[in-house]
Amino acid sequence: FNELAASGLALRTHGGIRFLEQEVPSVPYGLREEWNIEEKKAIAQEAVKYIRDSHSVMIYGGSTTGHLGFYLTQGRIITNLPDLCRILRMRFPTGDGPQVILTGGEFDFRTGNLEGPALRRSLENYECDVGVASAYGVDETGLIDISDECSEQIALMLGKSSLRIILADHSKFKRKGFCRSLPWNRIH
């Protein structure tokens, strides 16, 4: 409760909290990474089954995609999630794990991602075997996210990948969002 109130997402009340009215709340990464953690780990572990050691992988930062760092062992990774680098550094302190390229961009403290024009420029020269992303929500038409910026970056990273994998825990389904990212017919 205290963390939600401190982040500006909720107001403490007697006996609990009341969420503040926002069109689409951007919950800080530090909170999101703890929610549904066992489910997120299981989803990431399942996703890794589609990624070969020889693959290059583009990973859009998110609280679920970050868990891939606990399961990837080889290959080349391009990501906008600095926390993924932290996880891999802990797992491979001598540097014998995957090669990692961290995109450029401005660090967004709420999302935990690098974002903006520098990210887009840094991706211009790359294409990957596999693209992995999560989103604010998914519905019958496709992916939904919290901003044009996030939606555009997800579309860019997945668009530069041959195989596209979406990671979504149960809380993402039929969630109302703000921006359409990618329709299902562009994710295959």
Task: For every predicted segment, state its role.
Residues N2-Y60, Y71, P93-D96:
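HTH-adjacent hinge/linker in prokaryotic transcriptional regulators
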Residues A5-A6, R12, D83-H188:
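Conserved phosphate- and dinucleotide-binding cores of soluble alpha/beta proteins
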Residues S7, E34-K41, Q45, G62, ...:
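Electropositive phosphate-/nucleotide-binding environments in soluble metabolic enzymes
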Residues Q45-V48, G66, F70, R121, ...:
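Alpha-helical segments flanking ligand/cofactor-binding loops in enzyme cores
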Residues R52, T73, G159-S162:
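Short conserved AdoMet
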Residues S56, G61-L88, F92-T94, P98-Q99:
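Amphipathic alpha-helical effector-binding/dimerization core
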